[in-house]
């Protein structure tokens, strides 16, 4: 039971840019994803671009980690796109649903969907490790390489507390 509790993903909260960077530096090898607002304190003053600067810094260190920018200012969607982040409009009536879906899909909590890298068409879907074991050899090589090299599989395994195989697969990046 203790191991299961330790293996559960944790959410950490930063109130400033500096706190966010300290947390990222401390946990960067175990981060499933980053959710940030656009506007918060940086250098002791509220910076409307603090979250965008955080996205830029994290993306420069990890090209595959899922990023989410949430903002009441829809113009910030451009910055989310620039850094490969999802955007959540804080004014949306379904903000909580949008955020939940993105976290489930991008942070590895939902089903794992293997896609054709050229068409993004679904080629296989697994709900759990047993299903992965049953279909792994039927998944097209190109799809498997695509997902492994972008840390999709390792992130999915991390979210299920399967640390040894996740660590092993995270090191594999084919270009």
Q: Residues of each region from the PLM?
A:
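Output/docking surface of receiver
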Residues: 9-16, 44-47, 68-113
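Acidic, metal-coordinating helix/loop segments flanking the phosphotransfer/catalytic sites
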Residues: 2-33, 43
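Nuclease catalytic cores that cleave nucleic-acid phosphodiester bonds
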Residues: 54, 73-83, 165-172
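A short, hydrophobic beta-strand element within the central beta-sheet of small alpha/beta folds
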Residues: 33-36, 53-75, 88
């Amino acid at each position: 039971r203790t191991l299961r509790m330790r293996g559960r993903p944790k959410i950490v909260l930063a109130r400033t840019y500096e706190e966010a960077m300290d947390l990222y530096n401390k946990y960067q090898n175990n981060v499933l994803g980053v959710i940030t607002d656009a506007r918060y304190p940086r250098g002791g003053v509220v910076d409307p671009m603090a979250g965008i600067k955080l996205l830029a810094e994290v993306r420069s260190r990890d090209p595959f980690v899922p990023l989410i920018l949430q903002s009441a200012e829809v113009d910030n969607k451009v910055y989310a796109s620039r850094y490969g982040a999802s955007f959540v409009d804080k004014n949306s009536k379904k903000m909580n649903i949008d955020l939940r879906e993105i976290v489930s899909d991008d942070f590895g909590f939902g089903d794992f969907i293997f896609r054709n890298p050229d068409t993004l068409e679904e080629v296989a879907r697994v709900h759990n490790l047993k299903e992965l074991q049953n279909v792994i050899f039927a998944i097209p090589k190109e799809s498997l390489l695509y997902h492994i090299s972008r840390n999709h599989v390792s992130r999915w395994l991390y979210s299920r507390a399967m640390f040894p195989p996740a660590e092993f697969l995270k090191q594999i990046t084919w270009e």
